[in-house]
């Protein structure tokens, strides 16, 4: 499969305080087209926003696709590629037998990837990676309406 047949997705989440107001941002690239998405919530966590970025990106795809998701969140990458199998086997409990945090978002992410061929790639955050920097700016843009007025 050529690189032109792959949707490249860059995701990021941001939070002012943890918990606090937060936002998510997505940059999607397919061939010569780009699409930007962002949103936010009043009271959330950074991990929830990282998950929402990936979910929103995948849910925005109009047809089954080969997808490369680039994230600076090991929580998201490891959660969906490694930990989720054990969580499901253990009734959505973690290794300490506690309920998995953000289980509803993990289920939503799992459903969102089910029709796509997805590979997950970690990128170092805030390291002058242009596409990741754009996703970060979009996450901050998504968070902005929820920040207290100065």
Swiss-Prot record:
Family as reported in the entry's similarity comment = Belongs to the RNase H family.
Q: What is its EC number?
A: 3.1.26.4
Q: Where in the cell is it found?
A: Cytoplasm
Q: How is the cofactor bound?
A: Binds 1 Mg(2+) ion per subunit. May bind a second metal ion at a regulatory site, or after substrate binding.
The subunit field of the Swiss-Prot or TrEMBL record says: Monomer.
Could you tell me what this protein is called? Ribonuclease H
Indicate where this protein is primarily found: cytoplasm
Cite the binding residues for Mg(2+) 1.
12, 50, 72
**GO CC annotations on file:** cytoplasm
Natural source organism: Parvibaculum lavamentivorans (strain DS-1 / DSM 13023 / NCIMB 13966)
Q: Where is the RNase H type-1 domain?
A: 3-144
Per its record, the protein catalyses: Endonucleolytic cleavage to 5'-phosphomonoester
Please give the cofactor(s) recorded in the UniProt entry for this protein: Mg(2+)
Is the Plastid keyword given for this protein? Answer: no
* Keyword flag Coiled coil: no
Q: Which NCBIfam families match?
A: PRK00203.1
List residues binding Mg(2+) 2.
12, 136
* A single MF term (Gene Ontology): nucleic acid binding
Write down the InterPro entries for this protein, in alphabetical order: RNase_H, RNaseH-like_sf, RNaseH_domain, RNaseH_sf, RNaseHI
SUPFAM superfamilies xref list: Ribonuclease H-like (SSF53098)
């Amino acid at each position: 499969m050529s690189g032109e047949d792959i949707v490249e997705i860059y995701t990021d989440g941001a939070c002012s305080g943890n918990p606090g107001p937060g936002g998510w941002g997505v940059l999607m690239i397919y061939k010569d087209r780009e699409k930007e998405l962002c949103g936010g919530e009043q009271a959330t966590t950074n991990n929830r926003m990282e998950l929402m970025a990936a979910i929103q990106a995948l849910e925005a795809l109009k047809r089954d696709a080969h997808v490369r998701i680039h994230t600076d969140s090991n929580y998201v990458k490891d959660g969906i590629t490694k930990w989720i199998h054990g969580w499901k086997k253990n009734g959505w409990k973690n290794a300490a037998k506690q309920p998995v945090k953000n289980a509803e978002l993990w289920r939503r992410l799992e459903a969102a990837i089910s029709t796509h061929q997805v590979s997950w790639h970690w990128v170092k955050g805030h390291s002058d990676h242009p596409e990741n920097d754009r996703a970060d700016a979009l996450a901050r843009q998504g968070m902005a309406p929820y920040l207290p007025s100065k």
